[in-house]
Amino acid sequence: MKYLFYNIEYSGIDLSGNRYTLFSKEAFTDKDKPELVNMKFVEANFYFKDDTILNVISKEGVYNNKTLDMEFKKDVIAKYGESKLVADKANYSNSNSFLEISENVVVTDQKGTVHADKLLFDIKKQNLNIISLNNNKINAKINLK
């Protein structure tokens, strides 16, 4: 049995002490796995301690209301400062304090554009790893001005 909801909002603080909000126009849960909230037309905002904001939108997503983990799927768009990211998938792991972006990743900002297979952002350490799979190259156009 499935339970259908409209215009839902979750908010909280992750294990690193950062605040977040999560919105969905439509969502459903399954009786057998009530902790998993399957969502459509998703928007999340992460408010970091340094006063920066990460905004993520996607056509679909899954929120685990026990672990606070989030998965974003289909037409993922993220904005962080002057940077814009597009990808097919993004996973936020609250328990491991990281954000993994994968599949057709393109990051664009004032300094240039990067195409990669996967990005791993460690929230606690505030560092980014850019990964290429299957011996693919990471394509980057960087403006050094």
Residue map of PLM features:
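Mature-chain termini and adjacent capping regions
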Residues: M1-K145
